[in-house]
Amino acid sequence: MLPSLHDILDQHTYKWIFFGGKGGVGKTTTSSSFSVLMAETRPNEKFLLLSTDPAHNISDAFDQKFGKAPTQVSGIPNLYAMEVDASNEMKSAVEAVQKETGSAADNDAESKSEGDMFGGLNDLITCASSFIKDGTFPGMDEMWSFINLIKLIDTNEYSTVIFDTAPTGHTLRFLELPETVNKVLEIFTRLKDNMGGMLSMVMQTMGLSQNDIFGLIDKTYPKIDVVKRISAEFRDPSLCTFVGVCIPEFLSLYETERLVQRLAVLDMDCHAIVINFVLDANAATPCSMCRSRARMQNKYIDQINELYDDFNIVLSPLRHDEVRGIANLRDYAETLIKPYRFCWSANPDPSSAK
């Protein structure tokens, strides 16, 4: 396979491109640089870089402030970026429902619970109570990112959406959301249709009304048919691909393997891995620590090449300066499509140095 992302750049059918991996491996730099590359290579199309990481970094990468609405990247008229603010947006939705229904969850709702008499339904309503009361629930960041994605589909404004994802665990939850949302919608629909009386009684014991929960669902959750469409597109290798990002160290390699295996279970395409922070050092390098680190890195690079022999493996060198601003992002992007020639590629045995 080619040691570059050129095939992804050249395939114009991609609607969704994800960059993900362990925290601190350069996902934001890689996704931001690739979005610049795509936009400047295809100036007649519009692209969006969407951060789904609660700890957003794309504003820092571009040295430009981005928010919850798509904002044009300075100097690149066909590239937009946005950072999903899940907490504030979800609370706004909650407040809108409370205003419409004229109610709000009782802060002491949990004390009114009748214990476990309703089993799993009680747990579901407890979660909904938190949802209504303060606009938070487990997985909220991933959920709101997914809801924003649904909105983007409806506009059909961008040729490709590039995702700067959160660390692996968050990302996997996000990728599983189409199926999860579909199940949640079906559960609530069945509850509403078949258990209206019991549901109303349980919610009353918790200081809630059906209007609270179902009103909020109507405002936030997408329609089932759109969710199914997203699920199908994520699994279509002509429309969606995932680029793993890692560094040549054990923990990052382990996390990458976990990610690739899970993507296979989700039936999502992943055929490229970018390895960042690779030392350009060999046996002739005067720095003993550099030689030692290069020896360690090369061991893991060899393992990655062996594990993923049918993947595009891209090596990006450790840089003297941080990658920040358009000029530096462009410079970094070059290593994604033009293989960098490391000094050890001519003399590939830094381990010979003691």
Swiss-Prot record:
Catalytic center residues: 53
Matching CDD domains: ArsA (cd02035)
CC terms in the record's Gene Ontology section: endoplasmic reticulum
Major site of localization recorded for this protein: cytoplasm
Binding site for Zn(2+): 287, 290
SUPFAM superfamilies: P-loop containing nucleoside triphosphate hydrolases
EC number of the protein: 3.6.-.-
Coiled coil feature spans: none
Pfam families: ArsA_ATPase (PF02374)
GO biological process, one term: protein insertion into ER membrane
Subcellular location, record wording: Cytoplasm; Endoplasmic reticulum
Enzyme class label: hydrolase
Alphabetized GO MF terms: ATP binding; ATP hydrolysis activity; metal ion binding
Domain of life according to the entry: Eukaryota
Keywords: ATP-binding, Cytoplasm, Endoplasmic reticulum, Hydrolase, Metal-binding, Nucleotide-binding, Transport, Zinc
Annotated residues for binding of ATP: 22-29, 249, 276
Biological role: ATPase required for the post-translational delivery of tail-anchored (TA) proteins to the endoplasmic reticulum. Recognizes and selectively binds the transmembrane domain of TA proteins in the cytosol. This complex then targets to the endoplasmic reticulum by membrane-bound receptors, where the tail-anchored protein is released for insertion. This process is regulated by ATP binding and hydrolysis. ATP binding drives the homodimer towards the closed dimer state, facilitating recognition of newly synthesized TA membrane proteins. ATP hydrolysis is required for insertion.
Subunit structure, as described in the record: Homodimer.
HAMAP family per the UniProt record, alphabetical: Asna1_Get3 (MF_03112)
Family from the record: Belongs to the arsA ATPase family.
Identification of the protein by name: ATPase ASNA1 homolog
